[in-house]
């Protein structure tokens, strides 16, 4: 392991002299993690309401903007992971990303504080003139979002591995520390989501947007201060090269040698370096075209230690099998990523449903903020995970004999099924909400929308809880799947692939919203997705998404049947144990 020197750290390349401070630096890392998540989530969790109420955007426009913002943030993780692994290392990447995130939070707050940076407030009367944002206002808002995208994209793939770097993976104490750190990481993430979706959203919706957006900026500043306060104590692993280089090299060499005749597995070049720590993989029959990159010809010269003189002319069978692992995962990744196409609808249009529902709690005047309804999704996930881990897994283990009760792909498949159920429930509830709004006395008018249905907003909770449970199965299941099926040196890349799936779903959601709106606008009954949901047919849109998810489930079952799990021949013992600790991220 190569680390940067700190005041008390010693020479590079001397792993025995690295000072792992473990829990001594966790107050800095976990403290930063808590404030950073509060800052990022607090700035973006209520964004769709902010865009419709302060920037006077139409609901469908705001939903598209939020989808593009979320998609870009998630796709940015793969760029950040590449730069982190290839050039800067985790500490420098995190440092830059956190500063960018803080500046983005400040800029977002300024759009609310400074009146020229947002359009004039619209009158509440239906049909009144409502001016949208100017180009200058949009540009400033976009600049704030770009900074937040840079921050989120850099923090997500680096935070978890950086915390694990502080523990010695070769000691019992270190391995236990890594396991506990993952538990605390999940706890702080959930805690931040809950606080942001309740307290911060309440302040933004009921007190002041200026104060509500200033809170995340202040929290981000505190996170930066805490993180940099422990700077001299951290173990800082240097960049060691991106796995993307290895993937590219295998594919390029295979193309160069495409005219060679296939050979048997025993004839393939299979040099393994003495310091190699990945799981050693056996030969597989899938994608045999790539095997040609491991066929040694007379032109392929070797060094004295057996390594190739030119790595762009000859690859080892191990390198080929690692690339096969990545390629095998991609069809599964596509299906698992589409799960979030439905998930995103629950975090956008459910908010619009709640705005035209009775959000009162009991006989009092207190109303649940529309942006806080997604907290029930988080509650469903948070409550189900320990039940799954402590009750369902031991029960299933008795019948399957598997440590996890079921395979990772079976877990994802169960989540996809519940996702379909959630969308069907959403459609049925929307039918009822709209019927009540059109046939029974209403509770007034929602600004720039329409009549507020007397249906209780509590009816929206089941669809959110179902989606939360689906995420606990499909979302966490696919994260576990990527971590276990990718080679050990590609685990940062695996984490970024998970976020890229969410990003892909965000972009697809934007396209789907545009296609449905533009297509149905010409129908005699009008658009399915108008500003006033009582005049639309949102339930048809939900049924459409449920149908798409049904087709996706069929595709998932097909590729899951085709998939072959990673074939591990032997492992370096220390690395094997470290891998087990890293897998804890999924629980």
Curated annotation (Swiss-Prot):
Disruption phenotype: Decreased nitrate content in root phloem exudates. Enhanced root-to shoot nitrate transport and plant growth under high nitrate conditions.
Family: Belongs to the major facilitator superfamily. Proton-dependent oligopeptide transporter (POT/PTR) (TC 2.A.17) family.
Cellular component per GO, a single term: plasma membrane
Keywords: Cell membrane, Membrane, Transmembrane, Transmembrane helix, Transport
UniProt key word S-adenosyl-L-methionine: no
Function as written in the Swiss-Prot or TrEMBL entry: Low-affinity nitrate transporter facilitating nitrate loading into root phloem. Not involved in dipeptides transport, but has a weak glucosinolate transport activity.
Keyword Transmembrane helix: yes
Lineage: Eukaryota, Viridiplantae, Streptophyta, Embryophyta, Tracheophyta
Subcellular location field: Cell membrane
GO molecular function: nitrate transmembrane transporter activity
PANTHER family the UniProt entry points to: OLIGOPEPTIDE TRANSPORTER-RELATED (PTHR11654)
Organism of origin: Arabidopsis thaliana (Mouse-ear cress)
Tissues in which the protein is found: Expressed in roots, stems and major veins of the leaves. Detected in the companion cells of the root phloem.
Protein name per its UniProtKB record: Protein NRT1/ PTR FAMILY 2.9
GO biological processes: phloem nitrate loading; phloem transport
Gene3D superfamilies, per the entry: MFS general substrate transporter like domains
Gene for this chain: NPF2.9
Transmembrane segment boundaries: 35-55, 65-85, 94-114, 135-155, 181-201, 209-229, 325-345, 368-388, 412-432, 457-477, 493-513, 540-560
Source taxon at top rank: Eukaryota
């Amino acid at each position: 392991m190569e680390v940067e020197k700190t005041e008390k750290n010693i020479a590079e390349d001397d792993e025995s002299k690295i000072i792992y401070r473990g829990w001594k630096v966790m107050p800095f890392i976990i403290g930063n993690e808590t404030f950073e998540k509060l800052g990022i989530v607090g700035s973006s969790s209520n964004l769709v309401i902010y865009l419709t109420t302060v920037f006077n955007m139409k609901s469908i426009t705001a939903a598209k903007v939020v989808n593009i913002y979320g998609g870009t943030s998630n796709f940015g993780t793969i760029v950040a992971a590449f730069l982190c692994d290839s050039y800067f290392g985790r500490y420098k990447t995190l440092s830059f990303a956190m500063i960018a995130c803080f500046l983005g939070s400040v800029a977002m707050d300024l759009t609310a504080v400074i009146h020229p940076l947002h359009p004039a407030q619209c009158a509440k009367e239906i049909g009144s003139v409502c001016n949208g944002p100017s180009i200058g206002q949009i540009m400033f808002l976009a600049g704030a979002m770009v900074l937040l995208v840079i921050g989120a994209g850099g923090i997500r793939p680096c935070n978890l591995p950086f915390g694990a770097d502080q523990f010695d993976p070769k000691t019992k104490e270190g391995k236990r520390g890594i396991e506990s750190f993952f538990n605390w990481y999940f706890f702080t993430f959930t805690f931040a989501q809950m606080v942001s979706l309740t307290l911060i959203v309440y302040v933004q919706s009921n007190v002041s947007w200026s104060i509500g957006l200033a809170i995340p900026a202040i929290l981000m500043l505190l996170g930066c201060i805490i993180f940099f306060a422990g700077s001299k104590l951290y173990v800082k692993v240097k960049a060691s090269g991106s796995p993307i280089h290895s993937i590219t090299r295998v594919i390029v060499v295979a193309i160069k040698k495409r005219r060679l005749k296939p050979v048997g597995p025993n004839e393939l070049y299979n040099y393994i370096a003495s310091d190699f720590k990945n799981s050693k993989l056996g030969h597989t029959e899938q994608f045999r075209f790539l095997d040609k990159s491991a066929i040694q010809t007379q032109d392929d010269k070797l060094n004295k230690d057996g390594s190739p003189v030119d790595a762009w002319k000859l690859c080892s069978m191990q390198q080929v099998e690692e690339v096969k692992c990545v390629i095998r995962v991609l069809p599964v990744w596509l299906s698992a990523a589409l799960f979030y196409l439905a998930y995103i609808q629950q975090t956008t249009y459910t908010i619009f449903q709640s705005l035209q529902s009775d959000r009162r709690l009991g006989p009092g005047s207190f109303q649940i903020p529309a942006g806080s309804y997604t907290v029930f999704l988080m509650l469903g996930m948070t409550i189900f995970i320990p039940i799954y881990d402590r009750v369902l897994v031991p029960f299933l283990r008795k019948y399957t004999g598997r440590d996890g009760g079921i395979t990772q792909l079976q877990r994802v498949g169960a989540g996809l099924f519940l996702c379909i159920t959630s969308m069907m429930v959403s459609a049925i509830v929307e039918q009822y909400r709209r019927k009540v709004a059109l046939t029974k006395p209403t509770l007034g008018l929602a600004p720039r929308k329409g009549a507020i249905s007397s249906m209780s907003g509590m009816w929206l909770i089941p669809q959110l809880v179902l989606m939360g449970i689906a995420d606990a199965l499909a979302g966490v299941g696919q994260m576990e799947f990527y971590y276990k099926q990718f080679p050990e040196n590609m685990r940062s890349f695996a984490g970024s692939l998970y976020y890229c799936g969410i990003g892909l779903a965000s972009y697809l959601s934007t396209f789907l919203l545009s296609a449905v709106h533009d297509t149905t606008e010409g129908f005699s009954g009008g658009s399915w997705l108008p500003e006033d949901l009582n005049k639309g047919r949102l339930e048809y849109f939900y049924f459409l998404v449920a149908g798409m998810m049904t087709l996706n489930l069929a595709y998932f079952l097909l590729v899951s049947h085709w998939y072959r799990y990673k074939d591990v021949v032997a492992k370096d013992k220390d690395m094997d144990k470290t891998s087990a600790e890293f897998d804890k991220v999924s629980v």
